[in-house]
Amino acid sequence: MLTMLRSRCRMLMRYLHVGIVMLSSLLVCTSPWIIMLRRIPDNASLWDYLHVYLGLVCTGLGILFLINNCLQGKWRQYFGWLVGDGMQLKQDIVGLVRGKFPIAGGKGLFSAIEGIGMLLLVATGLSGLIWFLFQGTATAIEWRGYHQLFAQAFIGFLVVHLLLAISHIIDFIRQ
């Protein structure tokens, strides 16, 4: 029974990235249609409700994704620079300045960018959650601002992440 549960958890973790990509894409693409300030309006549209509740789901998935990627010492791959282990990151940046494209994996530039992306995803979700919890108060407006700031940074990450994924695929095809 325990083995089956572990197996199902591993399977869930494999699909977590896909689920986050799909939900994030939907949330980002529909966000221009969202009209909320201090609280969910009385005449809220389907898009408003979808954004709020799918955002809450995405927040939970983002937290699970971050935890899963930080377990068993894997956090050092994404955040090694926090403990002074930035040699590969430094080499990647120096190589990039010299026109050499960094390799994917390890503790280099790509992994550091992915780590920052995970933090931005969770920050976007948590700021949205806090905005939701404080709706109807003056504090909600403040958290709306934080949510928008983190969301814009996360969108920037998505663009960079997509470009890096495409470059990785092109590099893979060349070899």
Language-model features and meaning:
Residues 1-175:
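Membrane-embedded alpha-helical bundles that constitute the cytochrome b-like, heme-associated redox core
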